[in-house]
Swiss-Prot record:
Residues 1-8 are cytoplasmic. This is Glycoprotein endo-alpha-1,2-mannosidase-like protein. It is found in: Golgi apparatus membrane. It comes from Homo sapiens. InterPro entries: Glyco_Hydrolase_99. The keyword Protein biosynthesis does not apply. Residues 65-87 have a biased composition (Pro residues). The chain crosses the membrane at residues 9-29. Residues 46-93 are annotated as: Disordered. Its EC number is 3.2.1.-. Belongs to the glycosyl hydrolase 99 family. One of its GO terms (molecular function) is alpha-mannosidase activity.
Length: 457
């Protein structure tokens, strides 16, 4: 009898433990503090980029709670594998050329990939595993380089395989996917001619093909200037002049119409904090010694917001706005959804643009195996929709997506497929189709545009 009672107590304890674990797991999916739960019709569907080896900046205190946006459209009827989203899905996909894109939706794009068929060898797909900066920690993790096509520097496997960014068919397919997602501006990761990141090769000569292909799909191209060796206010002045002189007359070159009615090129400056505000002010303030203001090379310059103190640095430097880039909520002050309302208030008070960056998830352990604490699971699209809702809550002029195809950090919305090789089992978008994140993006893009119309009334 005592034995039976003991077994019953153990069983009851296990049931309670399971229930507690499930409850705590569900708590991780709730909207961050300071954000409303998704409104009617916006229920979640069931469906870091930083210098390599650098430590993660600490997140700061949460901002004041944000006011919810106007009520969204009514929910769609869920099918057995789905649940409501911002708008009903099309019964039949529309022809790509007839699909509308929105210039207020930007996506970060990488053209650094190469394959033996085009370049004679793999580029970036064979990314090295970056060692941790602490040798003691680094010793516990694998080192070396990935070996495509079975072993990629990515936790997901692209539907196109380990492709070359120079392949015209790949470019056309990418533009098709961008258009399916309603993305109107491709933000191209850019290095000056003859320069590249540590794992890549120069690719400025590919820009004309990207512009030409984008133009065929009514997509525009903006530039995301990367932190190459020796970058400062003087070299960026030369970069801006080169980009505008070389590409500024192309029909796909993106220009943003500001509040004064002037159409100016828009540039994102990655890791802008590496240069002092005083140096940037030489370039970006009207009285700077080599100012581009009120010259043919004037533009809209968007700085990267990482730490809270960067807001004042960005203002003093003469930038026109700030973006957050990182797709890992909580990784930095800027990437934390709960801080976006405070950032938007600061920007509004100082005539700056705030461009929040949203992503479908984050996992870079294929190239930084020690960085699993920054992984953000996709939860079949829920993480992405939570980020999109957080962005719309602050009523931004533009929303940026991290990313279309940064495969190393697992932030891509590009189509991925299930894949198992002798050495790897890749993540995928199951139980949904490879186009899941393109479909979610279009649905939210259309909702974003409708919301903006209400904001302006």
């Amino acid at each position: 009898m005592a034995r039976r009672r003991r077994r019953a107590c153990i069983a009851l304890f296990l049931v309670l433990l399971f229930a507690f674990g499930t409850l705590m797991g569900l708590r991780t999916l709730k909207a961050p503090d300071g954000l409303p739960a998704l409104g009617p019709g916006l229920e979640l569907a069931p469906f870091e980029r930083r210098p390599e080896g650098a430590p993660a900046p600490a997140a700061r205190a949460p901002a004041a709670p944000a006011a919810p946006p106007p009520p969204p459209p009514p929910p769609r009827t869920a099918d057995p594998g789905g649940s409501p989203g911002p708008a009903p899905a099309e019964a039949e996909p529309a022809p790509v050329q007839s699909l509308r894109v929105y210039s207020d939706l930007h996506a970060f794009y990488y053209s650094w990939y190469g394959s033996p068929r085009r370049e004679g060898h793999y580029i970036h797909w064979d990314h090295v595993m970056v060692p941790h900066w602490d040798p003691k920690i680094s010793a516990s993790y694998p080192r070396g380089r990935h070996s495509p096509p079975d072993d990629l520097g990515s936790s997901f496997y692209p539907e196109l395989g380990p492709y070359s960014s120079r392949d015209p068919e790949v470019l056309r397919e990418h533009m098709t996917q961008l258009k399916e997602a309603a993305i109107g501006v491709l933000v191209l990761s850019w290095y000056p001619p003859g320069m590249a990141d540590d794992n890549g090769e120069p690719s400025d000569d590919l820009v004309p093909a990207i512009l030409d292909t984008a133009h065929q799909y009514s997509i525009q191209v903006a530039f995301h200037i990367q932190p190459y060796k020796g970058r400062d206010d003087i070299t960026v002045h030369d970069n801006i002049k080169y980009i505008i002189d070389t590409y500024g007359s192309h029909g796909a070159f993106y220009r943003y119409k500001n509040s004064m009615g002037k159409s100016l090129p828009l540039f994102y400056i990655y890791d802008s904090y590496l240069t002092s505000p005083e140096a940037w002010a030489h370039l970006l303030t009207p009285n700077g010694p080599h100012s581009i203001r009120n010259t043919p090379y004037d533009g809209v310059f968007i700085a990267l917001l990482v730490e809270e103190g960067h807001t004042h640095d960005i203002l003093a430097a003469g930038f026109d706005g700030m973006y957050t880039y990182f797709a890992s909520n909580g990784f930095s002050f800027g990437s934390s959804h709960q801080n976006w309302k405070a950032v938007k208030n600061f920007c509004d008070a100082n005539n700056l643009m705030f461009i929040p960056s949203v992503g479908p998830g984050y996992i870079d352990t294929s190239i930084r195996p020690w960085n699993n604490h920054n992984t953000r699971n996709r939860v079949n699209g829920k993480y992405y929709e939570t980020a999109l809702q957080a962005a719309l809550t602050v009523r931004p002029e533009i929303v940026s997506i991290t990313s279309f195809n940064e495969w190393h950090e697992g932030t891509q919305i590009e189509k991925a497929i299930p894949k198992k090789t002798p050495t790897r089992l890749y993540l995928d978008y199951l139980p949904h189709q490879p186009s899941l994140y393109l479909e979610l993006t279009r649905r939210w893009a259309e909702h974003f545009i409708k919301e903006k119309e209400q904001w302006l009334m």
